[in-house]
């Protein structure tokens, strides 16, 4: 059974392993320089400290999905002044996709955003990530903008969910 919860320091090795596996699954989908750069960053000695700082920060949201003691998905983002949150990343390891874990993590992120007084959750994604786009649309996110050649030669779509 998959359990979604806030990340803890003891999760950091599993979090990084999950993060790397998710990014490796983007090989051949996203630009190589982008993917390999993220994977390389996750392997740096300073990366665990970066994750630990985010876990401890009151303006950050880091959630994990755990299955049989193993981190199989995660969502991370920031609560910003002005009442909105930014979902920086959400991902599930390939062998655990299509099981509702991404939806559970996104629901958890929205819940944490509400608890922090947010009235809007925003994110961006590449148009080639069709499963992510479907999830965001199914959860009520609406496109607010399109950024051409935004990063690493990729276009990005800016989405938001307005909370009531």
Model-derived regions, located:
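Acetyl-CoA-dependent GNAT
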Residues: 6-12, 16-89, 93-94, 106-108, ...
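Conserved glycine-rich acetyl-CoA-binding loop
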Residues: 70, 89, 93-107, 114-116, ...
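Residue-level signal for short amphipathic helical patches enriched in basic/charged
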Residues: 10, 116, 124
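Extreme N-terminal starter segment of soluble prokaryotic enzymes
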Residues: 1-3
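C-terminal "cap" of GNAT-fold acetyltransferases
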Residues: 119-122, 126-164
